[in-house]
Amino acid sequence: MAGCLFVAREDLPSEQLALAEPLAAVVAGQRWSRVEPDDVVLVMGAGPIGLLHLQLARHSGARAVVVSEPSAGRRAAAEQLGASVAVEPGDVAAAVEDHSGGVGADAAIVCIGVPGLVGEAIHLVRPGGRVNAFAGFPAGSVAEIDPNAVHYRQVVLTGSANSRRRDYETALRLIEGGHIDTAAMVTHRFGLPDVLDALGKVGADDAIKVAVLP
């Protein structure tokens, strides 16, 4: 059990530290995606996970991060947290072309459980690009993928789930060092007596993370 415990700075609010676990999974996911300095990265979905991927890609030295997201509120949050541009899904191909000089993204990370996005992402990365299916998908989901796009363009397709102890340690250091702004992602705070109101706010267009504080 001791191996599951981590020491964090005492001055960090618990609501910020609560995001260390999903951030650890994001750290693991970007290890598969191999995000490197000067990369152009596409993040599909600007929920909490997408916003963590965005920030970590920036911290890793990505030259540009393009975010695709249908919610106007979450697109605004993505731009506040460092996205080069946050666009509606229908505009993502043009945005990637613009920021990559027509070559395609170096890496695309699917952060929302829409199976069709996996096939779309394959066509949005450059030859030799990387696509990571980070999101979980509904049971029985099927994604249509053009195998020739993978074969001839030598696209690397991976999945990612869970994290290692070292990823959790990295996540804590990133939060403690101020490299990942988890505080900005907690958009609503409720006291324990108002827990039902908090649950009702989850999923709202203007909500990213909702915290219940003692």
Question: What is each PLM-predicted segment?
Answer:
Residues 114-177, 214:
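Glycine-rich phosphate-binding loop and adjacent beta-alpha segment
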Residues 33-35, 100, 125-126:
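A generic alpha-to-beta junction signature in SAM-dependent methyltransferases
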Residues 92-102:
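Short amphipathic alpha-helix with an adjacent loop that forms part of the alpha/beta core around
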Residues 119-123, 165-214:
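C-terminal hydrophobic helical "lid"/dimerization subdomain
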Residues 1-6:
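Glycine-rich phosphate/adenylate-binding loop and adjacent beta-alpha elements
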Residues 103-109, 129-130:
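Short SAM/SAH-binding signature in class I
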Residues 39, 129-130, 208:
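Glycine-centered, small-residue-biased loops immediately flanking beta-strands
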Residues 10-91:
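Mid-domain Rossmann-like dinucleotide-binding core that forms the NAD(H)/NADP(H) cofactor-binding site
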